[in-house]
């Protein structure tokens, strides 16, 4: 707060929404003159930055220290001199050596070509396949040839430039969708009721299928809060994953031991989710944001996103549970009617 009073502030993903709104609003109103930021403001924002200073072209990633791409640099310096606020903008790179090379590479260089992820990532292809089959078979089942034709006209296929690889990838994921019970191909491809529900939930079909496995555990009587939270934090869509620091490992071990039966049944081994799992467990136990922030050494914004992400996935899980409950009731009713008619 003292920094903001003096016209300077910082901006990063760990800020809670209230602080973020204040900082962005006051920066737009030019009451904040100097703003340091992580890549949260590097692209897609329109702020009155007359000058952008990049202190280093190196950044820590999951693979260690790496150079930022030319595209990232262009996005960063593109924040300076927005037409709505200024008639010019300045971009400065702090060079720790080799200024000529940096000038040639970043300032004069061409941004890297864009790459489509539609065919690179199985989850993306599954989502798009299910979506196409649903929309293309509104009145009649769609054919394999139509599916191939559609995807062969995408930017991803253009970059792939190999029809045989395209067909191989699509065939593999069509088999997966059938395995998950989301499409049929008796007289062409069309979605099942489960497939339609998953399509509207906008989630990876594999994630939805994995959730049904937990429903089976629930029906068998294995049901408690820790298990649901554990399942949610292990999903690929749960992106706020942090390993547990050593000082919390004992608390995590106690939780696991108390819920050992379910933990072993789920067969999850991703320890990177454990800190998020502890935060969620304390959140539903009514621990305040401030206490959680101090206890887990986590920023309020990170805790907020962990909570919101978990809420979204919990909703998805609830909808899948509702679907299978209604589906089971419908099948039971059909069975009773059939027995009565016979």
Model-assigned labels for residue ranges:
Residues 1-34, 62, 66-69, 146-149:
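Conserved C-terminal RecA-like helicase domain
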Residues 3, 7, 26-34, 55, ...:
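Conserved, well-folded catalytic cores of nucleic-acid-processing
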Residues 5, 17-21, 34-38, 66-77, ...:
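Amphipathic alpha-helical transducer elements in NTP-driven molecular machines
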Residues 11, 35-38, 54-55, 86, ...:
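Generic beta-strand/beta-sheet core signal
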Residues 20-56, 64, 78, 191-198:
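Beta-edge loop/turn motif
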Residues 47, 51-61, 65-107:
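Conserved segment of the helicase C-terminal RecA-like domain
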Residues 87-174:
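C-terminal or mid-to-C-terminal helical accessory/interaction module adjacent to the motor/catalytic core
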Residues 126, 131, 142, 157, ...:
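C-terminal helical accessory/scaffold domains
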